[in-house]
């Protein structure tokens, strides 16, 4: 975990990892680490390379040094002075359509300066190298509902939301939420896609009916105007694959801030609840956390907020505290609707441009279907 803020000098290289085939990408990874990070990595003869399963925007690999080139360069003694490994993130093809890479890097550096998360070690043309969170595992969707992890995630997310994030290139950045600004941009991109001869995808997108999705965005915007939610520095993509957990000291960190930025608190928490489904939204109704699980998360979040702000607004367990949780529950579940539209439209765009082996259009279809299901459920229960 980052204990020393951002690196004094961020190492950068014009080196580009070839992505024309999985083998060429995999084989190029040791060289990118040697080239970008320099000594002592450039004296490492071999690395153990492992692909990490997580998100579906990029490809992630862990590289652990195995042996030095020559004993006089340090041998085993120097090898022990190296970190156990580094993470290499290779950006997905055409992801610049969806992600502002400059802001992505600024997010990473700004959070690193706050000693939040892992360090950014270096950049190359189509990716970056990050600190490896030692002895950690990547959580699975089924882990998110485990009580001890629910509490830890809630507390860490609260800490992130309370950070005073300043991006040095912009000075004091205007706290403008990204939700609807991004949705407008993405749905315009989705509408402009030429599917060519791919009639299957073309017909499936026509069935989704992006015109109706636009109408739902307007409906949601009006609903959320009536739903107070503070603007915080949000992760915006807190799926299980972006949470690393170390059981030895019960510590966890969030990674991958490329969708991060100022946004509504309710969206960030609601989006995390949606991620209990992983990438299979056919079972969304079964795995979306029930009220009891949500209230456990929200209680841990609210208690951490009171602790960090030294607030005596309401005592945990008091009627005032429970009223606060009920309001937060409504806020989060309303904003969760935005998560479905956000990632639903994203899936349509990725279905056109991404080379990652994943059915993005199916994912987009399922997220938009989950929006309609959730909207109906909220209306039925008097929450919308």
Question: Language-model segments: which ranges?
Answer:
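Catalytic activation segment of kinase domains across protein kinase-like and atypical kinase folds
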Residues: 241-280
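Catalytic-loop of the protein kinase fold
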Residues: 233-235, 240
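Helical subdomain adjoining the active site within ATP-dependent kinase catalytic cores
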Residues: 201, 310-384
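A general structural signal marking secondary-structure boundaries and capping sites
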Residues: 37-40, 157, 161-168, 194, ...
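Active-site activation/catalytic loop segments of kinase-like enzymes and analogous catalytic loops
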Residues: 266-315, 337-355, 370
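ATP-binding pocket architecture of kinase catalytic cores
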Residues: 50-213, 219, 223-230, 248-250
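Juxta-kinase regulatory segment immediately upstream of eukaryotic protein kinase catalytic domains
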Residues: 1-51
């Amino acid at each position: 975990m980052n204990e020393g803020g951002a690196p004094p000098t961020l190492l950068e290289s014009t080196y580009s990892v070839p992505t024309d085939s999985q083998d060429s990408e995999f084989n190029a990874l040791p060289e990118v680490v040697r080239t970008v990070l320099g000594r002592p990595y450039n004296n490492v003869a071999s690395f153990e390379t492992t692909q990490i399963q997580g998100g579906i925007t990029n490809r992630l690999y862990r590289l652990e040094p195995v042996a030095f080139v020559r004993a006089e360069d340090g041998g085993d003694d120097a090898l022990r002075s190296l970190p156990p490994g580094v993470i290499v993130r290779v950006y997905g093809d055409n992801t610049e359509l969806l992600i502002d890479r400059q802001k992505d890097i600024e997010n990473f550096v700004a959070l690193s300066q706050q000693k939040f998360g892992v360090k950014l070690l270096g950049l190359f043309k189509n990716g970056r190298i990050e600190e490896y969170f030692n002895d950690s595992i990547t959580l699975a969707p089924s882990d998110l509902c485990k009580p001890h992890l629910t509490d830890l995630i809630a507390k860490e997310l609260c800490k992130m939301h309370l950070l005073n994030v300043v991006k040095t290139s912009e000075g004091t950045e205007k706290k403008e939420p990204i939700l609807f600004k991004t949705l407008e941009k993405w749905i315009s991109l989705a509408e402009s896609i030429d599917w060519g001869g791919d009639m299957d995808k073309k017909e499936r997108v026509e069935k989704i009916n992006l015109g109706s999705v636009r109408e739902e965005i307007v409906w949601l915007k009006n609903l959320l105007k009536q739903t107070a939610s503070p603007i915080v520095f949000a992760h915006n993509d807190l799926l299980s694959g972006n949470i690393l957990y170390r059981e030895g000291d019960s510590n966890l960190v969030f990674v991958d801030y490329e969708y991060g930025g100022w946004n509504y608190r309710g969206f960030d928490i609601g989006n995390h609840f949606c991620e209990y489904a992983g990438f299979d939204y056919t079972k969304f109704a079964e795995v979306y956390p029930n009220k009891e699980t949500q209230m456990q998360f929200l209680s841990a979040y609210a208690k951490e907020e009171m602790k960090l702000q030294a607030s005596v607004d309401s005592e945990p367990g008091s009627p005032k505290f429970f009223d606060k949780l009920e309001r937060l529950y409504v806020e989060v579940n309303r904003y969760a609707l935005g998560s479905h539209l956000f990632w639903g439209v994203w899936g349509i765009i990725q279905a056109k441009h991404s080379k990652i082996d994943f059915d993005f259009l199916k994912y987009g279809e399922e997220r938009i279907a989950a929006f309609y299901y959730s909207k109906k459920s909220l209306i039925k229960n008097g929450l919308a």
